[in-house]
Amino acid sequence: MLKEFKEFIARGNVMDLAVGVIIGAAFTAIVKSLVSNLINPLIGIFLGKIDLSNLVFSIGSAHFRYGSFLNEVINFLIIAFVVFLMVKGINKVMPKKEEEAVKEGPSKEEEYLGQIVELLKKQDK
């Protein structure tokens, strides 16, 4: 069982996934820093508050922390946009695979045409 596990881990897909998860976690930290240290203060200039995470409105004793939600939406949009750009860039760099023509048998029309040709040849004899 240990041998199977080693083979599983040694496969390229698992290693690629592990690297992707680690890079993704590091990238998330960078995006959160970008949002909280650069984007939120920029937005805060127009709203009059620098820290968006403290934006709250209350109805009775219920407090709706929409500022924290805005931070998460901004984080998501930035990450989604960067992933989009990365995929687009990778697709440009990667060689396009030529679609291999799969040879199948003749279509029904071709079979019928072949039979018609044979019948016509027999009639001419």
From Swiss-Prot:
Tell me if Protein biosynthesis is a UniProt keyword of this record: no
Record localization: Cell membrane
> What topology in the membrane does the UniProt record assign?
Multi-pass membrane protein
User: Which Pfam family, just one, is annotated for this protein?
Assistant: MscL
- Where does it sit, as one GO cellular component term? plasma membrane
Q: Which UniProt keywords apply?
A: Cell membrane, Ion channel, Ion transport, Membrane, Transmembrane, Transmembrane helix, Transport
The molecular function GO annotations come to: mechanosensitive monoatomic ion channel activity
* Segments passing through the bilayer: 19-39, 42-62, 67-87
**Family to which this protein belongs:** Belongs to the MscL family.
Described by its record, this protein's role is as follows: Channel that opens in response to stretch forces in the membrane lipid bilayer. May participate in the regulation of osmotic pressure changes within the cell.
What does the record note on quaternary structure?
A: Homopentamer.
**What protein name is recorded for this chain?**
Large-conductance mechanosensitive channel
Record the organism.
Limosilactobacillus fermentum (strain NBRC 3956 / LMG 18251) (Lactobacillus fermentum)
From the UniProt record, report the name of the gene that encodes this protein: mscL
